[in-house]
Amino acid sequence: MVSSRRGFNPIAFTPWPVTILTSLVYLALIIPIIVVHHLVPPAPKQSPPGVDLEEAWHDLQHLTRQYHPYNSHSNDEVHQWLLKRIRAISATTSARSESQGGPEVFVFDDNQTNLTFSSAGVAATAITGVYFESKNIVVYIRGTEDEPGEWWKSPDGEPSGKGGVLVNAHYDSVSTGYGATDNGVGVITTLQLLKYFTTPGHYPRKGLVLLFNNGEEDFLNGAYAYSQHPMSKFTHTFLNLEGAGAGGRAVLFRSTDTEITRFYGKSQHPFGTVLARDAFKLGFIRSETDYHVFDGVFGMRGLDVAFMEPRSRYHTDQDDARHTSIDSVWHMLSAAITTTEGLVSYTGNEFDGDSGEGGKLNNGVGTLGVWFDFFGSSLAVFQLNTLFGLSVALLVVAPLLLILTSVALFAVDKMYMFSMYTYLSESGGQVSLYGLRGMFRFPLILGISTALTVALAFLIMKVNPFIIYSSPYAVWSMMLSTCMFFAWFISCVADFARPSALHRAYAFSWMFGILWVFLVIATVYQRQHGIASSYFIVFYFAGVSVATWISYLELFGLSTTQDYARRQSRLSDRTPSSDSHLLAPSADELPSSGSVAGRDFNPEDVEDEEPTESTSLLRGQQRTTFANYASARGSQESNISNQGSSLLHPKNNRLEQKWSIYLVSSAWILQFLLVAPIVLILLGQLGLFLTSATYQIGADGGSQFIIYIGIAVLSVLILLPLFPFIHRFTYHIPTFMLFVLIGTLVYNLTAFPFSHNSRLKVAFVQEMDLGTGKNQASLVGVEPYIRDIVHAIPFVNDEEISCTSKGYGGRTKCSWPGLRPTVVDGPYKDWVTYNISQTKEDKTTRFEVSGKNTRACKLLFDSPISDFHVHGSVVDKRIPHTGSKGVSEVRLWSRNWENTWTVDVEWTKKSAERTGRVMCLWSDDNDLNLIPELDMIRKFAPWWVAITKLRDGLVEGSYSFKL
């Protein structure tokens, strides 16, 4: 007797190898992707030369002791502390410079620059005008190849030589956050860059400008003001350090071009994908960073590196040093050192080219890029043109290759796919090939599993739409398990009813066709809109194309359809009875050692072998119940595992098409490895990145349905590489996925959506009508939770609460009479003083505005004005301060407290009623009882609530006017 285990094939297309190998590959890739996404690489135990991590951490703790928005006294304290730290580092450098020839360091405390510009609005609406006075700190480290002299002291001075490098970080925080990651880590990183590039061995070849800008949180004011500083003429490239989350890894948000991105790609732990840049470009991400000014206004070339999650801590009291880590500091710092070092050491002329339009700098022209990281350890960077060329090549070559292969198969008479019958050339008799069996199985499996997965998105949105806010992985698990289980279940039912050896080939063919259409759309967007996020489709399609081609190549190993028809005809002639199917051998009867009774094995001999009294009467008969499927299939695999030839198709040739006995049993593993790994790496990263960027936008009024649909679609795309093989899975993993589905579905439908680590953000503002004494405190948040929060505040009567959702972008504003704030000593009517006067021609109105204990006021107009001018202000033709639809609001910022602004306003001809409000703002909440209503909310609001600011001021005091 021949051993039953002889010739076992561990990669045969049988249930256990398929289940185990595919599961191992998925786990081996998904687990590292999740780990890399959430765990920050550890900081070195000993600080590298040129930096001091312990010092950096102490600086971060000092910087984040208080809220320090621009309109606060603590902001002045931070400003003075930064100057002290910068000068201390510079003094060490100066002493070293005298003895070792170190670089010169120049510190500019910018207390003179101002600018009038517009900060928001589009052509179809009135815009917001801004007047801002700078409190920026600019540090220039002269490069070893920079021209000597102090050209900036001359009013018309211009830099010579190659352009320098700018590193920017804003040091103001919001009024409700300590600013540890937004943007304390960026500030501390910039301080350490000053130390690093003034340390021997690290001196920059090109000049380095470090900008500590103030006023970013109030619509990028500090970056706009930098446009008026002399150093803005010198810097051609930039690195912007920012924070839109609270901890984790620093992400490459955006980059202007391929060439600049390559410098970041050399960092030790690059992290990011071009998807973020495209999201900004398409308007899916509306918040902006200083990158917008440096790129869009100045025409500089550079990068935007920022923290991105969790957004529930962003702009709240949990954006503090306790909720970040030295590892996060090092991740940003190490990337900044590598990127900046590459830029200041670059000697080419790539960033010194022709002048841009609109007075932009001479920065040359870059190429749009594509980038994505691999497990946070390397960065793939290439041009969008390369991606476009590859896309076009695949769109043409891949279908052509399949067509030529199909023609060749027809030519050699081996095209079993798409063929129901063949005809004997001798007699013209018809022989069934069953080549269409399983042809429409894949769209059925894909359609039903996708529909059920998407249906869950609708269900969650209907019952518990905010569950993703705190439990994104519960949502992912639910979607993945739904798709996985139902795809397997439908596949098994179809395979039980109509087994087909062509399931793999047809599945890949359908995938090929669907992805080809997706690639056409992606290619159009690449060319016409510069959208590069479709890179995963290109690689997905490439893998599927080769896998599909392999399925076609497998058919060359079969006999011709004519030879098969002749054998079947001879068999039919010898056994004309209705029981002729008994002549088909069972799996046990196939030889295990390549021979039968001492002679060479030939499948034709087996087919012609007569049944005997010892032949099983049940072999080859169709299964009749699904209950018998598992045992029949398990017995079948057990028998097949004992066969001697690894090239024979593993299933009983009666259960699938008889000609399939010659199909290569191991080809499936090559197909799987061509598709699954690259899909998991690219889509896994994209899925987690999208989740991190969007899963908490619901608190800001964003559509959560898009998030659920996105996860559902990504779940299908991630599992799609399994679909050609999933009918071979054992029941164990799908059954486990069913339990996961049930558990996560119940949890997602019933669990409370917020937690201590994922608090719901609501925005606060208190509005004082100084003319009438009306005092309204307000919270803005999402329904129905905003009403529960307001009702939890003591001394607020239900009949006094008024709520409206108009004009708040999916959120609701609930207001009630609040406790009087004490942001100013004295009667509230004295908080704001103003005077309005008309010119003789009645074309211009002059406003004189001042507020006590503040340096921020604004003018609001019920009808847009055509123009305005702030006395003593500078205007820049690169940055228009008015628009075709006029100006509806003028914001006034001063570096001095209780300043008086003089503003001349020109009215449009349509301004029949000249009405509006004169308003001043107060943003300092570092002491108790300054804003007692806010103190009350913080004390009595539910534990799952976080307070953030609604607008620039926590308290707004205003007078109405009518001319």
Curated annotation (Swiss-Prot):
Cofactor requirements of the protein: Zn(2+)
Residue spans of biased composition, Acidic residues class: 603-612
Residue intervals annotated with topology Cytoplasmic: 1-15, 413-441, 495-504, 557-668, 727-732
Compartments where found: Vacuole membrane
Source domain of life: Eukaryota
Cofactor binding comment, as recorded: Binds 2 Zn(2+) ions per subunit.
Presence of the UniProt keyword Zinc in the record: yes
Keywords: Glycoprotein, Hydrolase, Membrane, Metal-binding, Metalloprotease, Protease, Transmembrane, Transmembrane helix, Vacuole, Zinc
Membrane topology reported for the UniProt record: Multi-pass membrane protein
InterPro entries named in the record: Fxna-like_M28_dom (IPR048024), M28_fam (IPR045175), Peptidase_M28 (IPR007484), PFF1_C (IPR053975), PFF1_TM (IPR053976)
Glycan-bearing residues: N111, N114, N835
Transmembrane stretches, start-end: 16-36, 392-412, 442-462, 474-494, 505-525, 536-556, 669-689, 706-726, 733-753
Annotated GO CC locations: vacuolar membrane
Gene Ontology MF: a single term: metalloexopeptidase activity
EC number: 3.4.-.-
Class of this enzyme: hydrolase
Active-site residues annotated for this sequence: E216 (proton acceptor)
Role summary: May be involved in vacuolar sorting and osmoregulation.
Protein name per UniProt: Vacuolar membrane protease
